[in-house]
């Protein structure tokens, strides 16, 4: 038995020695290759684990050497709180996984900034590698993604400190505060923003992360982690980087899309297009090249050339080697961020064509911008920005207005794209403005999706709005009226309603149609310049169209006296003017409401008072009897010249146009506005004392106040005035009946005369035999009937001719 044990032990030792001998491989290699990973999913089987370890190889190191390195490496276990934080980062903090690449490139840019700063005082800082670049390489075969920078690199201690510890202090306190904030439904962005953990976004897409780094003050080291623990060891290959860091991601199976070149290129252009340092992606392209032909191919081609003259020329000339065109796939580094951030340059140094080219590239538009502004803001927060007004309004500009995010302002921090998912960067009414904002002062939270200090964002917003309004104001008048106002006029009106702090600036940008010109629009400044002497109010009339507004009874006397009236023809117009208390010291007057008064002499005043006294019986009769419960009061009008009467709203009531808009909105939402305070207010009934109908009514009621015809006429006038004043009738049937009664009286027809009864036709009697015959031979019966009808018609025609 003992001999068998000894024999078995010898066999094991011989086998082990054979394996070690077979595994010895040369250590030399290049920096371009790094890790690989098996597709096996299970890690419980020893064979699977072995195959996986053999697949993961560092450049120049075989599987056994990798295992030996891992055994010798110093391992660090994440604490329980750090593990919780890691899970929080991976599972909840990031809104989309693709930002891992943005974070890695951003960190690479920071490292390059540091070494460039060091090189200003240390001339040997760049001796290991003079180029400052970021390079990205996809390895589909090994399921690897490499991000390499030639930045400052990290020492062993820095790898442990920077990559091994998420929260540099107060990890438990941070988690407790975050838990409390989540329970209270509060934002955790301010807490998260204190911890720079963008590197760990790599675990969103990777099962394992390996960092190879070389610092000028230390040897090259390898850091490795699977998000549960990490290890650090000196790189046995020596200095293969020169200086800098390579981050290698062993991608998860579901993240394989990030090995596609198009995906990586699009992400670089989306997030890191304006990084200060060049970013290269290892890309392939097909090129047509000329290669020398094989001897057999060349001989065959010469044989095919049978032209004797060509043959003679060839003998005379020096023989050239035969070549052929071949398509080859060529791999090389492709520059991704060739568009330089022109907002970082002084505006005086940027040509107009550069702004236009940048706008087209940035916005994906084919037209030039209508206007642009380039500025640097300083103060509480410093930032650079370029803003553009597009030539035409974006499609669906007012779809889901206010609830839909505006993605036309892109926020950058140190040339790194952060987000365009903002509700607060610009106010809703400026949702058409496109541009970029770049600041070095903005603090970011862990995912860079929201800002840590909202106060700074408000400062930026305030300056952006002011600069945008300055830009719009500088657009030439002809271009503004013909183009800008047609595309974005509604936005400016909404701004007057919504933006209290900039209301005065926005009011100067308003444009409306007016009685001054049949087609041109006018500004409020121009209206005020044309105001009559002693005119203290800006008159406006609202309607569904210009034709409706200018034919309204409310503008008759104003136009006759030469006053200019602004026509509000858009649904938002009346809201806009109501939000403006005044303009240039002049208050607005809705001519469809009370308060329209004219400057009058003493003689005119005496004449008006005499007319009011003359028509006092009619006014009292209308208020107390004919139109009782329908009107607030009846007065002699100062605004009517042609119409007999009009229905005027109180100063705080709804005009006809506003009531129509409110009812349309209520219909869409299913609300009932009949009980609304403004809708239920009674109106003032104004009469024109010079109109023949009104004068005749005065005569009639003096003779008989109970005259039914006059009572009907008063109600018809009221309902007609309701319609002409822009309001809707609650009972159109009753109105129609009264109109019919008035028509009967005008034609001397008895108002109570009945409509003649329509004679009823008796049904024809048919026998059963006839019915059966008809069913049996229907076609024949129809033909016979037709012939008989034609004969009868011919007889009648002959008889009529005889009579004539």
From Swiss-Prot:
Record family assignment: Belongs to the heat shock protein 90 family.
Biased composition (Acidic residues): 289-317, 757-791
Name of this chain's protein: Endoplasmin
Basic and acidic residues composition bias: residue spans: 792-804
PTM: Phosphorylated by CK2. N-glycosylated cotranslationally at Asn-217 by STT3A-containing OST-A complex: this glycosylation is constitutive. In response to various stress, 5 additional facultative sites (Asn-62, Asn-107, Asn-445, Asn-481 and Asn-502) can be glycosylated post-translationally by STT3B-containing OST-B complex, leading to a hyperglycosylated form that is degraded by the ER-associated degradation (ERAD) pathway. In normal conditions, the OST-A complex together with CCDC134 prevent glycosylation at facultative sites during protein folding, thereby preventing hyperglycosylation.
Signal peptide (from-to): 1-21
One GO cellular component term: melanosome
Modified residues (N6-succinyllysine): 404, 633
Location of the motif Prevents secretion from ER: 801-804
InterPro entries, per the entry: HATPase_C_sf, Heat_shock_protein_90_CS, HSP90_C, Hsp90_fam, Hsp90_N, Ribosomal_Su5_D2-typ_SF
Sites of N6-(2-hydroxyisobutyryl)lysine modification: 168
Subcellular location: Endoplasmic reticulum lumen; Sarcoplasmic reticulum lumen; Melanosome
Highest taxon listed in the record's lineage: Eukaryota
Subunit structure: Homodimer; disulfide-linked. Component of an EIF2 complex at least composed of CELF1/CUGBP1, CALR, CALR3, EIF2S1, EIF2S2, HSP90B1 and HSPA5. Part of a large chaperone multiprotein complex comprising DNAJB11, HSP90B1, HSPA5, HYOU, PDIA2, PDIA4, PDIA6, PPIB, SDF2L1, UGGT1 and very small amounts of ERP29, but not, or at very low levels, CALR nor CANX. Interacts with AIMP1; regulates its retention in the endoplasmic reticulum. Hyperglycosylated form interacts with OS9; promoting its degradation by the endoplasmic reticulum associated degradation (ERAD). Interacts with CNPY3.
Annotated catalysed reactions: ATP + H2O = ADP + phosphate + H(+)
Originating organism: Macaca fascicularis (Crab-eating macaque)
Notes on the domains: The SRT pseudosubstrate motif associates with STT3A during translation in normal conditions, preventing glycosylation of facultative sites until HSP90B1 folding is completed.
Gene Ontology terms for molecular function: ATP binding; ATP hydrolysis activity; ATP-dependent protein folding chaperone; unfolded protein binding
Ligand binding (ATP): 107, 149, 162, 199
Enzyme class per UniProt: hydrolase
